[in-house]
Amino acid sequence: MYKFVISIGLKPGALEQILQRALEVQRLTRAEAGCLAYDFFTCTDDPDRLVFIECFVSKEAHALHCEQQYTKEFIAFHEQFHVSFTFERIGTDNSRH
């Protein structure tokens, strides 16, 4: 299993623009055979922070997700609003592969 959290600090006022596109990307991603979970959350402590929690059956399934045109377009769109970006792999001790 390949599970991770992405935390994105955004330029002020960018959150709504990203959320407008995020729902469609979420729908498409959840339909991928290798996707186990694809969720995003607004941060209650910081209105300019967006958090994604994603889980794929494998690192390869995530790589395939990254090759999808809708994924590339969504990333290219929201990157222009980044102030910070953190990617953290998460899991239990027995999921370190």
Where are these regions (language model features)?
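Glycine-rich beta-strand-turn "strand-cap" elements at beta-sheet edges
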Residues: 2, 40-48, 75-97
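Short, acidic/polar
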Residues: 20
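Short, glycine- and small/hydrophobic-rich beta-strand elements in well-ordered beta-sheets
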Residues: 26-48
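An amphipathic, aromatic/His-enriched active-site/gating alpha helix that lines ligand/cofactor pockets
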Residues: 30-36, 55-88
